[in-house]
Amino acid sequence: MNYSFTERKRVRKSFAKRVNNHQVPYLIATQLESYAKFLQADKPAMSRLTEGLQAAFTSAFPIVSNNGYARMEYVSYQLSQPPFDVKECQQRGYTYHSALRAKVRLIIYDREAPTKVKEVKESEVYMGEIPLMTENGSFVINGTERVIVSQLHRSPGVFFEHDKGKTHSSGKLLFSARIIPYRGSWLDFEFDPKDILYFRVDRRRKMPVTILLKAIGLNNEQILANFFNFDHFSLTANGGSMEFVPERLRGQLANFDVLDKNGVVVIQKDKRINAKHIRELEAAKTKTIAVPDDYLVGRVVARNIVDPDSGEILAYANDEITEELLATLRDAGIKQLETIYTNDLDSGAYISQTLRTDETADQMAARIAIYRMMRPGEPPTEDAVEALFQRLFYNEDTYDLSRVGRMKVNSRLNRPEMEGPMVLSNEDILDTIKSLVDLRNGKGEVDDIDHLGNRRVRCVGELAENQFRAGLSRVERAVKERLGQAETENLMPHDLINSKPISSAIREFFGSSQLSQFMDQTNPLSEITHKRRISALGPGGLTRERAGFEVRDVHPTHYGRVCPIETPEGPNIGLINSLALFARLNEHGFLETPYRKVSNSKVSDEVVYLSAIEEAKYVIAQANATIDKSGKLADELVSARQAGETIMVSPERIDFIDVAPSQIVSAAASLVPFLEHDDANRALMGANMSRQAVPCLRPDKPLVGTGLERIVAVDSGTVILATRGGIVDYVDANRIVIRVNDDETAAGEVGVDIYNLIKYTRSNQNTNINQRPIVQAGDRVVRGDVVADGASTDLGELALGQNMTVAFMPWNGYNFEDSILISEKVVAEDRYTSIHIEELSVVARDTKLGSEEITRDISNLAESQLSRLDESGIVYIGAEVEAGDVLVGKVTPKGETTLTPEEKLLRAIFGEKASDVKDTSLRVPSGMIGTVIDVQVFTREGIERDARAQAIIQEELQRYRLDLNDQLRIVEGDAFMRLEKLLIGKVANGGPQKLAKGTKIDKEYLASLDKYHWFDVRPADEEVATQVEAIKSSIEAKRKQFDEAFEEKRTKLTQGDDLQAGVTKMVKVYLAVKRRLQPGDKMAGRHGNKGVVSKIAPAEDMPFMADGRPVDIVLNPLGVPSRMNVGQILETHLGWAAQGIGKRIDEMVRQQVKQAELRKFLKQLYNETGRIEDIDNFTDEQITVLAENLRQGLPFATPVFDGATEAEIGRMLELAYPEEVATSLKMTPSRQQMILCDGRTGDQFERPVTVGVMHVLKLHHLVDDKMHARSTGPYSLVTQQPLGGKAQFGGQRFGEMEVWALEAYGASYVLQEMLTVKSDDVAGRTKVYENIVKGEHTIDAGMPESFNVLVKEIRSLGIDIDMERN
């Protein structure tokens, strides 16, 4: 096995039974690939595929002017380099974007000969700014990181459904069909309770479907021929004869005696015709059956019947036959007659009945009827009618089925080919109606809307493309109007195209769309989950109110595609989902999941991705099926799935097998160990709460994990990976310099990688992002190794919480109802201390009365308040501040006091500005204490920078220069090494220090020279001389390149900042706030076991073990049985074993046991069960490092659905606690419980207690952020009642029920106070305030404002109401 540099330092013992060769794919690949497809930035212009921007351009262009004399064509587009990098955009509040320029060609034709080209103009046109995706799949919009969530919407195509009997009181199923395009009008077909078929366009008024059939060019005869089989009759003088078709007679009631051709009665009247009768008729070789007139009456004529002599139409298609009609036909000598065949069972007369309700005569009349429905009130001219009908379904500009839609339509209508036109054809409409009629006749099944074959995912790229198209279509309309003037006014393409609509459409989408969300950045897991989220909400999707139970439910096709566990609780449940671990999108946007191929019950390594539609055809076994040594399925019957049903089949019938047991869950759920032992509801809470864990100051890897911790940490982008292999040259807290291996450097590029670490940076949720190096100078790393840890990661593994020793027992009521009792030792060790970074900003504006000024010179401020400010009036970095302290001094001009004429004159003479200023400094908000860690000053172009701003720029430049110098140092070092090798032993023609001609160059000589003088040595060999020259010029070129880069950086930093209108200067101050654990903070395990800290007890009061160690946390045992999350108990036991093994290794290291013994113990641990680790290949030094890292505990991986068994946990506990240790600790024989003692009395508790180690998280619901109190504050405008909520500095609502409580106590004065002076009696509350200030404590309650509001409300209804005063 290959271990990376960091993996080797601490190997996780895995209990996985199944070796999974299929790696978990890159977790944010869907986002990155989708946007890369949209931009196609790395492809040359001419070889771009028609998708994304390219598709939008090609669909909008060419644009032809209305008169046809000018035409604009699209050639290609290109994206420029972004002006600022991601970090600069975040600091300055810019959008990380690239400018889009399109090359466009304007062709003007000759008016005399319209085919002749008069002139062609080509130019590049600016098309707006396109935001770029960062390498981690997010966007920086106005300085904040955002994520575009993928949307799950109904796939375009044709769908058949019924109303489940809800519409009509009889419970009759009403069938309907709907053709949904990607863009354009929806076409619905539906039956009503009387079995008449209607259609509607875009949910408008319904009309009989035959109007549409006539509009597409069918007449009544053709309509009937398309939907019915015909019965053929020959008329005789009385009665007639019917062609004998056996299958149409079976099951009918004979209403006359049926005779065979010999005149023998085969079926008597009023008998039901059965198979025996049919056989008898066939045996008698019956071709026709004689029928009486009664049998013909009431049937429906299939074709127009024309009198052969006069040409008069005697009967129209769809007329019913009457006795009179039969007489007329006989008189006219008509011998043959065709009627439509219908019966009540499987061929109803629906279309025939619909045709009777339809009053339109021909195609034009039908189209006019459709026009009147779509455009009521407009006069239908022939051209307008024709144009509208074409635009509805047949025009590529207005109607687009898309490739997906065409594929879905063709497959649903059972056609062999999957390609076709992107607009509707008459066949599509006809086949859809036929299928719907078949459904009504009992043939076929309705579609399942929630099947993942009928719902597809729209990713970032597609959503952005749709917005771009919308913007482009607005541009197109404007260009079309102006193209006519292009020739007369000699305009260029860029004069015609205005890119504003495109920019605004894109900006609106990224800035304020429902799917563009503020990135959840609490910890790395929440980041990665947010990017893998799939929402059914948003434009073109569902709404919370309309979504029923079915849409939200878990569907069998979710298996391996969408996680059944991870979804929010509350109104969005089931509408927002997470992508499963291995799922990906196919070219059509449907979710696929991988399976390994099985042939003849042998499992191969070939992996096939199947979509939900394809999967239904196969029998698929689960990943935990038993496989023998030769790779064959071993059991006689294997549990498998087929079309969503679970079945037991023989191994030969299996087509595929799952790639991994964790295939069905998402990233967050797959991090929960023993997930298989938790109840679904609690598993959901566990997965959701992991995303709210606050990064701790000292991250601690979970002792019991699932093996995915490393994958999630690496894919989230929080850790730094080596982009190329090499040797670590230099490390400090801020940067890592790696000298790259020669074979990984391309010719002419710098063989050095510099990684600048992110230090104490604020995340979107105000948590702290900080990276720490985990390599040392001299370490050799390979590509992809972790070189620095980020927030919530420990040695490249995700570490969301801390490993706590827990005991399950009640403790004096302090863990009643999920409360948590915690030891003071945990707080003292800073285990759960987290740093939160607050950004506070202040702006100086130009006001009517003059400019605001940022200054230290503020009157009426004590020197103690100013002591932390520098001469520019900005706080120093490192200052410790608390609520009310000034961070940035600022003064604002105040309105002039009225001046006497004399003063005015003096002001006018001496030109003094307003002297009155008020103090509007930035102060620390209430309830906040912290340290200033960073200050940023932004100054508008043209305004002089203050000393502080210049100092910040200098510092930034110095840091940049340091990076360049490092690169140069390594480049020059390499060059001089090559030069030395080149020169030593060569003969010189001369050189510095009067080197004689013909002397051999040696090491001593070179050492005596300054390195830069080596180039002055003149080698005798011409070739060597050229090589020396080449090295010299390459160094000079690099120097020049670095100097240019430095100058570019300087220009960027010194140019003015782009601030809002009227703002001259902006200062941002960053405060680091340290939050220790305290009562009221919310904590949780990974199994949905959450609670609030009730008390932090002294360590000496906590229950302790026989060896004197107190436990860290005491949890209530009653929280487990009813919640059914037993996973936490198994985690506790396995964590206990992990800690015990760590103690044993620690003992071995301290006693300095022999390497062989240590190796033997490690092999016993790693290789008895589960995955085999390659311990033999470790060097002694690596074993020492490994053992050092295992002293805190041996980390376990128990993968989801493939984890440790009870026997394995038991075995690990035995290895951790040998007999003598277990006895000394008073453990039960299973080592899962022990006798504890009460910390306060020292007495033993009477029963053994479950003790172990659990990974516990501190959640982002901290009491500091929630604690709030109000004295006086803002009031609502209308009701004059206090506002609510901490953000508004609101009060606590005294509601209806609270009023009842006071009424019940008879506390009338308290009640009066609550409802008047403490709430909305405006005069009363002002008076009370004044009284309190004076020291009097009296109340004058008046009329509450809300009573006046009620009176006004009643008056507005026209009822005069007045107060009676007595």
Swiss-Prot record:
Entry GO MF terms: DNA binding; DNA-directed RNA polymerase activity; ribonucleoside binding
Keywords of the record: DNA-directed RNA polymerase, Nucleotidyltransferase, Transcription, Transferase
Domain of life: Bacteria
BP GO terms, sorted: DNA-templated transcription
InterPro entries (UniProt xref): DNA-dir_RNA_pol_bsu_ext_1_sf, DNA-dir_RNA_pol_bsu_external_1, DNA-dir_RNA_pol_su2, DNA-dir_RNAP_su2_dom, DNA-dir_RNAP_su2_hyb_sf, RNA_pol_bsu_bac, RNA_pol_bsu_CS, RNA_pol_bsu_protrusion
GO cellular component annotations of the record: DNA-directed RNA polymerase complex
UniProt keyword Transcription present: yes
Functional description taken from the UniProt entry: DNA-dependent RNA polymerase catalyzes the transcription of DNA into RNA using the four ribonucleoside triphosphates as substrates.
Family per record: Belongs to the RNA polymerase beta chain family.
Protein name: DNA-directed RNA polymerase subunit beta
